[in-house]
Regions:
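Conserved active-site alpha-helix within GNAT-family acetyltransferase domains
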Residues: 105, 116-142
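Conserved acyl-donor/pantetheine-binding loop and adjacent beta-alpha core of acyl/acetyltransferases
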Residues: 48-82, 87, 97, 134-146, ...
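Active-site rim helix/loop that mediates acceptor-substrate recognition in acyltransferases
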Residues: 14-46, 50-68
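A short beta-loop-alpha structural element at the N-terminal edge
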Residues: 1-7
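Glycine-rich phosphate-binding loop
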Residues: 90-91
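Short hydrophobic/aromatic beta-strand or adjacent loop that forms the aromatic wall/cage
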Residues: 34-36, 144-151
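Conserved GNAT acetyl-CoA-binding A-motif
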Residues: 96, 101-115
Length: 177
């Protein structure tokens, strides 16, 4: 993923209150390129996804450099999925399926912060809300009122996986983590 200009333009449109500098995006891409994708539609780049190894029940700070990824990471953290409104209808779902396979190959859990009241969307994939402690609740506050920390335990979901969502008519790409 190299088109930082398009990524930043999409981020500014989708996440106007969750600003992150271009250098912060670039660092995440450099630290874990396997988790980063531009999402392409008929019109070109219509979205992006950023994910990287992290620790469960912890949230990487917004607009801050990570410097490195934790050696003892126990989850694949979905930092952001953003798709332009006119292009929603499947491209984000394909990215999440890619992350699912990546996490399964390493035995990791998937984690994210659901924003903009998208919790029910993430639940369709298999993510579940997690009870948070005071420290995590304080960090969630900077994401807005509807922010919810969620995990998808892929090992537990193996036997009871919900049906994969996202028919073209569904609004899956409204997922903005």
């Amino acid at each position: 993923m190299t088109d930082i200009t398009a990524i930043i333009a999409i981020a500014e449109r989708i996440h106007p209150d969750l600003f992150e500098r271009p250098d912060v995006f670039a660092e995440k891409m450099r630290l874990f390129p396997d988790g980063c994708r531009v999402l392409v539609g008929d019109e070109g780049i219509v979205g992006y996804g950023l994910a990287h190894p992290w620790k469960q029940h912890q949230i990487p700070p917004l607009d801050c450099f990570l410097a490195s990824l934790p050696d003892d990471a126990d989850c694949l953290y979905v930092h952001d999925v953003a798709v332009l409104p006119f292009a929603r209808g499947g491209v984000a779902a394909a990215y999440i399926r890619t992350l699912e396979q990546l996490a399964r190959s390493s035995g990791a859990v998937l984690a994210l912060v659901s924003v903009y009241a998208t919790r029910s969307l993430w639940e369709q994939f298999g993510f579940r809300s997690v009870t948070t402690n005071a420290e995590l609740r304080a960090k969630l506050a900077c994401y807005g009122e509807a922010a919810t920390y969620m995990l998808w335990d892929l090992a537990a979901a193996q036997s009871s996986r919900p049906p994969t969502p996202m028919t073209p008519s569904e609004s899956a790409d409204q997922a903005q983590t």
